[in-house]
Amino acid sequence: MKPVCPNMSWSSRGPGPYGIAATATENSEPRMWTRTEDGSVVDDTGKVIYFSLERFVRDIGLGDCCFICGASPSDVPFNNEHVIPEWILRRFGLFDRSLTLPNGTSMRYDRYTVPCCVVCNGLMGRVIEQPIGALTEGGYDAVNAWREQHGILNLYVWIGLLFLKTHLKDRTLRAHLDARKGHARIAEELQYDWGGLHYLHTLVRCFATGTGIHTDALGSFFIVKVRGDASGQVFDYGDLYHSQSVMLRLGDVAFIACFNDGGNAGLFLKQKLDRITGAVSDVQLRELATELAFLNVHLKDHPKLQSYFDLELERHEMRGSFVMPELVDLDYAIRGKLMHYVFRDMFGKVKSYRWTDQEFEAMVVGGRATFLFDDHGAFIKDDAPLP
């Protein structure tokens, strides 16, 4: 499949299922599968093939078990997993730098971890992190060439792991540092829907379970070429929980994904992508990520994402139902809120020769501002001041 445009790749839709070749089933001896009372599926060694929603919430969402296998820290050794992979922290010198949490407070990247056992952490490193770390060193061209040959599943799972870890971490972080405002955690304050994370958790564990993933179980996924600009920024990460969307930039390559749209929000975003004729800036990248989230929350219907089992054959597959890609009436006030949140650390830094900082922020809140196109609808290719 050819890229949608020379600087972007778009996920294809086709038959499945597909799996990540190297899985935790490195010992390929078949194991008898059974279903537990809570609806989970386990093999005869007790390994969890599928976490029921009840078990996921109890052990992973609200518990302290390994987020991959569900083992308790009282039973096996843990060394925990960095939310942002350690090789990214090393490559971009982020260990002693801080990220901004949804509550506006900061946390150092090297302390931003989630519970993970030693075995699963090692497996994830071998199967996911090390290959993708090596691949991304080659930048956009190498990543795009690899995707053309191998497809998107490995990259999609990797980005999904980042999103999952980020929001599992939110269940442990206080929403308010001022105790007078209560002791709720960020996940409680923002009313996280564990069902959404449960589906993603099931999918991204495929490297450890051998689960087959049909392409209709995947959402929108884009690889974007990013140009260097005056900001000097080479790493960027952000996500929007309720729209199940995420963006990650590593040098000149960036990834944008939406996990629950069945690819339909991406179909509408393609109308803008077709007008982009070069690499994007860091600001334009954030707008694209926001636009994907905005379109996703305006889809008329979302696919049902489900697991299918054959316990006798020890097979687990994930599929998504087909829904017609349709949008409800677009509410640009929602776009304004999303844009304001995504750009909250950039106000005062992005300049326009026509408006003051305050006027431009007001335009962003209004939901109609764009960094992608000029007044004539042409793509803005350089770092000239915004019109």
Which residue stretches match the model-derived regions?
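An N-terminal structural lobe/cap that precedes and organizes the functional/catalytic core
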Residues: 5, 10-20, 25-140
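Generic signature of intrinsically disordered, low-complexity, basic-rich segments
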Residues: 17-21, 64, 147, 156, ...
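Structured loops at beta-to-helix junctions and adjacent beta-edge loops in soluble globular domains
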Residues: 69-72, 118-120, 158-167, 249-251, ...
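Internal, well-ordered alpha/beta segment that forms a basic, Gly-enriched binding/recognition surface
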Residues: 97, 103-188
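C-terminal, charged low-complexity interaction regions
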Residues: 7-8, 18-20, 28, 183-387
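Intrinsically disordered, low-complexity boundary segments flanking structured domains
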Residues: 65-70, 144-145, 242-244
